[in-house]
Regions:
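Long, low-complexity C-terminal extensions of enzymes
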Residues: 68-108
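Glycine/small-residue-rich pyrophosphate-binding loop that anchors the diphosphate of NDP-sugar donors
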Residues: 2
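Secondary-structure end/capping motifs
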Residues: 5, 10-85
Length: 108
């Protein structure tokens, strides 16, 4: 899992930046997953890659790297809890306070 952060000052001057980064990430993931599935030649030197992709689709419902708060809530809450317990952050904020709203984004 990766998390992209935008400095508040940059976001406040350029509020479009969050949705642009999200859209670029969604498109990048779509292209990468399509390339993995292309059977003309393998994207990686794993002869069982197609079987692995099918199993991943079965187990994760088609997307092992879902975007948005809701599909990642347990992981995000654990991250905030651990950071607070280990004194990296002064208080454990609600997850919604950590992300800007992205209208139309999946899982938000």
């Amino acid at each position: 899992m990766h998390l992209v952060a935008i400095r508040r000052a940059i976001y406040e001057k350029n509020p479009w930046i969050a949705s642009s980064l999200y859209s670029a990430s969604v498109e990048s993931k779509r292209i990468a997953r399509a390339r993995l599935r292309y059977a003309g030649s393998l994207a990686a030197m794993l002869p069982w890659l197609q079987d692995e992709i099918e199993e991943i689709d079965e187990v994760f419902g088609g997307d092992p790297f879902a975007y948005g708060i809701e599909p990642n809530r347990p992981t995000l809450e654990a991250l905030v809890r651990y950071m607070h317990e280990q004194h990296f952050i002064p208080e454990a904020l609600p997850i919604e306070k950590l992300f800007v709203p992205l209208p139309g984004a999946a899982g938000t």
